[in-house]
A protein has these predicted regions:
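Short strand-coil-strand connectors
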Residues: 24, 62-66
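Short, charged beta-strand/loop "edge" motif centered at a coil->beta-strand transition
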Residues: 29, 38-41
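Short acidic-glycine-tyrosine-enriched beta hairpin
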Residues: 65-81
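Short histidine-centered beta-strand/loop micro-motifs
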Residues: 18-20, 40-45, 87-89, 108-109
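Histidine-centered metal-chelating micro-motifs
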Residues: 38-39, 60, 76, 81-86
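A short, N-terminal "cap"/entry segment at the start of jelly-roll beta-barrel domains
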Residues: 1-26, 35, 107-118
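Short, conserved beta-strand element in jelly-roll/cupin
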Residues: 32-33, 44-62
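Ligand-binding loop in jelly-roll beta-barrel domains
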Residues: 80-106
């Protein structure tokens, strides 16, 4: 068994990576909305926060009724209770990664969790 997983992602509207990468601590999806498109529902989560990384394009998130403009390179974190919906700009598609993890579950990270090989 290998210590890594690698896949390539097509330009599909949504690709969930938990099964294809064997994820055990997070859900990651890659999402594409055409110009003028939107996620067709408002949602929030029971326990998971979401981190959205805008890979290309422009659009907005509506979080608890507030418009948040988004463009390439922006990153937005939304708490579990935040009611959210995503929209592409009328003249631009948008592509983004969504990382979903249980809020409050991060026990160690980066240098605190790394074991440096000699």
């Amino acid at each position: 068994m290998s210590n890594f997983s690698k896949i390539s992602v097509a330009n599909d509207p949504r690709t969930e990576l938990h099964d294809s990468l064997g994820l055990t601590g997070a859900e990651i999806s890659i999402n594409h909305l055409p110009a003028g498109g939107s996620v067709p529902f408002v949602h929030h989560h029971k326990t998971n926060e979401e981190i959205y990384i805008i890979l290309s394009g422009r659009g907005k998130a509506v979080v608890d009724g507030e418009d948040v403009e988004l463009t390439t390179g922006d990153i937005i974190r939304i708490a579990p209770d935040g009611k959210r919906q995503f929209f592409a700009a009328a003249d631009s598609e948008i592509s983004y990664a969504c990382i979903q993890v249980k809020a409050g579950s991060l026990g160690a990270y980066t240098a605190d969790d790394a074991l440096i090989e000699e």
